Amino acid sequence: MLAYKQIFDKGLKPYYKHSVCLKLFFRFCFLKTHAYQQRYQAFALTLFSCKFFNACKIFLLAIGFKIVFIPILEAKLKRVSNAY
């Protein structure tokens, strides 16, 4: 977990000051991601990909949706199905 946090922190520094999309993504996703190791990994991969793609904003929004919303939707669906 600590290793992923270090990757996350190091990976963020070169981009954070210059990228509006990353600032939005960081604010939106960090609270959701800090407890989950695989989500640190996903964020580090997102930063890596952002370096190579100019379509960073769209890419980050798509990844952010997958990381944040889909697990929440799955959990809600499970709760609903368990209730019946």
UniProtKB/Swiss-Prot annotation:
Phenotype upon changing L2R: In strain: NCTC 11638
UniProt-reported outcome of changing E74K: In strain: NCTC 11638
Protein's name in the database: Uncharacterized protein HP_1070
Species of origin: Helicobacter pylori (strain ATCC 700392 / 26695)
Lineage, highest ranks first: Bacteria, Pseudomonadati, Campylobacterota, Epsilonproteobacteria, Campylobacterales
